[in-house]
């Protein structure tokens, strides 16, 4: 077997207290999922058991939630955007989301509204999709360097798309300014002072994927010991972890938060025990994770309940893409993009590492470990996906 060393910096969470949040509970997840189930075309995304890979890596189970199958959008993000927009409209028109369907909501809206957001691709596509479904307008801002394919996917949903010359976090601030000037509703997946309601709804919407996964694992007769969650601002990681620890308890779930080393604001915050922002270009292939300022709502859950934080190089994500796209033994093939594959990439990088055994012990990975991984996206940038998987871009160096 080849041996090579990729950068995987692991920090234990010294500020863990196991305090869960009622905002991201099982009951809130059930409410969100009930809404999503009423959207035409809803079905749970697959939970794929990679049994042969698990055997190779020395664990009991590797379970990958494949979000490339979500509503034909190739990513999970619409779960948050659609749910938040629906909650916003229900509040505005005094409607009850528990009894309302997406179609009924569309018919109840008496005016044209414009929803604005900043995105690296998937969240904006989800907001654009929801706005289109409801007959509304969307204006989507993207940071510099955004892939044209991700821009086109948003334009194809009838939204306006503006690529700035700023990084993600500065683009968020620009979006806020323009929204205030034009009277648009901002649907952003990060929070700040005076802006928490919509990001809370978005995070609650993300929990649908976790509720599905728990149901699927119960049908398989397995209970997860580990979960790897990738983080940008930490909205998905916080919303999903909040739900999972409500189901299994923080003490019984070894949760690992993974980020690119060029945008590792959650990792640095985890080391300090308080929010740390990261600036600059944040140049990483993991475009969906290239965020330098943690969502305070997500950060609180991660600080309280995450077991460990990981900061890793881009080659870890690229390795994950290749392993998932070229399955071992009889395992199913999973098309996973840069931000989607980094969790599995960590497992693969540990397997090939010269200090494999000590890393396995550090992460409490052993023959009894049942590991849940979320592949949050498919090949949302096909050109770059092929450069990585076909052409060997960001290769490992033995």
Swiss-Prot record:
User: How sensitive is activity to pH?
Assistant: Optimum pH is 8.0.
- Disruption outcome: No growth on minimal medium plus DL-DAP; growth can be restored by a mix of 8 amino acids (Arg, Asn, Cys, Glu, Ile, Leu, Met and Thr).
**Which of UniProt's keywords are assigned here?**
Disulfide bond, Lyase, Pyridoxal phosphate
Q: Mutating residue 77 to H/R: what's the consequence?
A: No longer binds cofactor, loss of enzymatic activity
Q: Does the keyword Lyase apply?
A: yes
Question: What Pfam families does the annotation carry?
Answer: PALP (PF00291)
Quote the record's cofactor note: Binds 1 pyridoxal phosphate per subunit.
Q: Does the keyword Cytoplasm apply?
A: no
So what EC number does this one have? 4.3.1.15
What are the annotated disulfide bridges? 265-291
Q: Which reaction does it catalyse?
A: (S)-2,3-diaminopropanoate + H2O + H(+) = pyruvate + 2 NH4(+); (R)-2,3-diaminopropanoate + H2O + H(+) = pyruvate + 2 NH4(+)
List the active-site residues.
77, 120
* Family to which this protein belongs: Belongs to the diaminopropionate ammonia-lyase family.
Q: What does this protein do?
A: Catalyzes the alpha,beta-elimination reaction of both L- and D-alpha,beta-diaminopropionate (DAP) to form pyruvate and ammonia. In vitro the D-isomer of serine is degraded to pyruvate, though very poorly; other amino acids (L-serine, D- and L-threonine, D- and L-beta-Cl-alanine) are not substrates. In vivo allows poor growth on L-DAP or a DL-DAP mixture but not on D-DAP alone, this may be due to a poor promoter. DL-DAP is toxic in the absence of this enzyme, it may inhibit enzymes involved in the synthesis of pyruvate and aspartate, as well as amino acids derived from them.
Q: Subunit composition?
A: Homodimer.
Protein name in UniProt: Diaminopropionate ammonia-lyase
Q: Which organism is it from?
A: Escherichia coli (strain K12)
Gene designation: ygeX
